[in-house]
């Protein structure tokens, strides 16, 4: 059932609803705290992937969490320095240098603002369910695979701590539902490691934590214009990848919370957050679906306050409590992400009984989305491949739904009725569905039950008429209405008869 606090999508309403009760307020606080802890190792890892100092990623995440809490269209969604954007920007840093990064992030944010105001979010309706399932399942696989580096070639005690963490997260909800299991697991395992002097990899081993708050900088706009040709492709790629991942994450959270979010606002809000991150020398980012799942699904957070607190707690933890945070064993955080991966996977979509009922084409599209995403390690590429595959499958199905039937025949006139959608994919089959040895003097092509969509369909009808004219027949098109009639008159020289 929909949570009462999710009925206010506006910013003020969402923040106010966080204070509607002590239980809700407590949930938002715990959600922000657990999410901030889960952000630290992921952000540090993605910073290393992008080729920047881990402090850059942590400051970026603080600014973007705080920014999106006010500008975003999906309350409780977590936005930070994400891996998908890091993968796009990494070649820019590697091939051209760090000085190109901030102008590229600034440009990417401006592109996202423009696309958001231009209504790009409306394109979400063209992403089918099979692609969404593939996206979610691929994400679960990527989250799982990203943790393997932390459990390979490590001391054997790491596996013990992972097992303890997993056990706590499984058992704890049966004992207490107030405090999130992931937070309990992190605290308990950290205490065991410190008190037991257990030598295992920690958060500190992933990179240096900052010792102060981020300082404002003025992006070198002149430098950006001078090297626009270099940064533009990377900025455009990061903008599109970030938007796709954020909008898909927002849709996923909509399904979990049973609430519709403002995708247009999320689009330009993400752009504003990226622009803001550029003013602290940030690396750019987008929605972090793993951390969002921790916040929304595990912590049950529902308002903007949890997102705001995730950013605030992140900064406080790494600056004020950096020494303590640095001692958190990676085993605890890996276990948290394992649970996130397990719960993120749409098990119903891969159930053999479901797969047997689903059309083979939809299963193939879901599989293609998963494979493309995992192989490229890029969710946006997987979604694009899935949408293209789904489009091809749909076009193929619709193309075979066109029929031609001879409905009237006399020595003088023979009428053929065309039913279905006439467009580039179906037009070729239509041409070969007529009887060109028909002895009638006049051939009528009845399109009253058909829709003429493009020039390929018009060209096919002209080809049919030409074949009959070569045999001395008179050809006329009847039954055309609306847009089909307009296209036939504008694009062809066919004889069109109104009935």
Language model: regions and residue ranges:
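Core transmembrane helix bundle of multi-pass membrane transport proteins
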Residues: 1-33, 38, 89-90, 94-257, ...
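Intrinsically disordered, low-complexity non-transmembrane regions of multi-pass membrane transporters
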Residues: 1-26, 200-217, 399-417, 472-499
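Membrane-embedded helical hairpins/re-entrant loop segments and their flanking transmembrane helices
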Residues: 17-26, 30-33, 38-75, 225-305
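Hydrophobic residues within alpha-helical transmembrane segments
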Residues: 33, 63, 82, 106-110, ...
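Hydrophobic alpha-helical segments within and immediately flanking transmembrane helices
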Residues: 42, 59-68, 82-93, 310
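Short, non-helical or kinked segments that cap or interrupt transmembrane helices
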Residues: 50-59, 73-86, 121-135, 178-184, ...
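The feature marks cytosolic C-terminal regulatory regions of anion transporters and related permeases
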Residues: 344-493
């Amino acid at each position: 059932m929909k949570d009462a606090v999710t009925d206010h999508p506006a910013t003020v309403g969402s923040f106010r609803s966080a204070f509607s009760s002590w239980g809700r307020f407590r949930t938002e606080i715990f959600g922000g705290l657990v999410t901030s802890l889960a952000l630290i190792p992921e952000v540090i890892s993605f910073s290393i992937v992008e080729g920047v100092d881990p402090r850059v990623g942590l400051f970026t995440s603080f600014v973007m969490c705080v920014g999106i809490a006010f500008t975003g269209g999906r309350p409780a969604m977590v936005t930070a320095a994400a891996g998908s954007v890091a993968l796009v920007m990494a070649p820019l840093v590697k091939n051209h240098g760090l000085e190109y990064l901030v102008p590229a992030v600034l440009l990417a944010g401006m592109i996202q603002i423009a696309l958001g105001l231009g209504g790009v979010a409306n394109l979400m309706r063209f992403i089918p369910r099979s692609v969404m399932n593939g996206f979610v399942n691929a994400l679960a696989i990527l989250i799982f695979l990203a943790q393997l580096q932390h459990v390979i070639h490590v001391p054997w005690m790491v596996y013990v701590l992972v097992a303890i963490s997993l056990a706590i997260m499984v058992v704890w909800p049966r004992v207490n539902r107030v405090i999130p299991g992931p937070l309990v697991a992190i605290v308990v395992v950290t205490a065991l490691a410190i008190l037991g002097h257990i030598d295992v990899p920690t958060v500190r081993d992933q990179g240096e934590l900052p010792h102060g708050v981020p300082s404002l900088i003025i992006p070198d706009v002149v430098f950006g214009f001078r090297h626009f040709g270099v940064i533009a492709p990377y900025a455009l790629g990061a903008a599109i990848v970030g938007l796709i991942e954020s909008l898909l994450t927002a849709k996923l959270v909509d399904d979990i919370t049973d609430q519709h979010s403002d995708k247009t606002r999320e689009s330009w809000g993400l752009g504003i957050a990226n622009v803001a991150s550029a003013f602290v020398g940030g690396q750019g980012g987008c929605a972090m679906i793993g951390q969002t799942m921790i916040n929304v699904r595990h912590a049950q957070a529902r308002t903007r306050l949890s997102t705001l607190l995730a950013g605030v707690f992140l900064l406080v933890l790494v600056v004020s409590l950096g020494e303590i945070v640095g001692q958190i064993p990676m085993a605890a955080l890996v276990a948290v992400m394992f649970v996130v991966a397990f719960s993120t996977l749409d098990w119903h979509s891969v159930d053999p009984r479901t797969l047997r009922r689903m059309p083979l084409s939809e299963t193939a599209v879901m599989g293609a989305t998963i494979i493309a995403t995992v192989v490229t390690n890029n969710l946006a590429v997987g979604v694009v491949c899935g949408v293209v595959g789904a489009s091809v499958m749909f076009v193929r199905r619709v193309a075979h739904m066109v029929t031609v039937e001879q409905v009237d025949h006399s020595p003088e006139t023979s009428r053929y009725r065309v039913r279905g959608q006439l467009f580039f994919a179906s037009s070729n089959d239509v041409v070969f569905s007529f009887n060109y040895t028909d002895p009638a003097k006049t051939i009528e092509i009845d399109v009253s039950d058909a829709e003429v969509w493009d020039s390929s369909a018009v060209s096919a009808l002209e080809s049919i008429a030409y074949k009959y004219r070569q045999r001395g027949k008179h050809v006329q098109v009847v039954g055309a209405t609306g847009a089909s009639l307009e296209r036939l008159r504008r694009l062809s020289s066919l004889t069109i008869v109104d009935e």
